[in-house]
Amino acid sequence: MERHQQDLSELTTRLRGNHRRVTGPRQLILNLLRREEHPASAREIHEKLGDLCNLATVYRSLHLLESMRMVKRFDFGDGSARYELLGRDDDGHHHHLICQECRKVVEISDCFPHTLEERIAHRHNFSNVTHQLEFFGICPSCQPA
């Protein structure tokens, strides 16, 4: 996906373009999210960064990056938000299939609810209608033999 192909200089340029400082922790978080295959929680990011960045700074940075539409937040139903890097022109729209046992995440690019969004928006006179949909199941590795 596009988000994994962005280099750190492009991401820091986006920060500067939004009149935000390019701090060490922000660079570390962006660089880590560039390499992640799946959305990561603030705690997972903090654990991977270790003493390089405290947990409160991770949360503040993720909140800022989300407000700038550089990351997207996902809720997998376990009480822990997860974050994924967005590309410059990426709306981040895709879904996930999550194993209820091992928490393995598979990215799903198919999206059928777009036409439903249009009908709902028209029927209720809403604009900018969107959705967030995640699928849950048991992966082959966790299924009983």
Language-model-derived ranges and their functions:
Residues 5-19:
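Short, Lys/Arg-enriched N-terminal segment that forms or immediately precedes the first helix
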Residues 8, 25-26:
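Short, leucine-enriched amphipathic alpha-helices that occur as contiguous helical runs
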Residues 22-24, 35-41:
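Short capping segments at the starts of secondary-structure elements
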Residues 27-32:
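Pre-recognition alpha-helix immediately N-terminal to the DNA-recognition helix
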Residues 44-49:
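A short acidic, leucine-rich amphipathic alpha-helix
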Residues 58-68:
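Basic amphipathic alpha-helical segments that dock to polyanions
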Residues 68-145:
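Non-DNA-binding regulatory cores of transcription-related proteins
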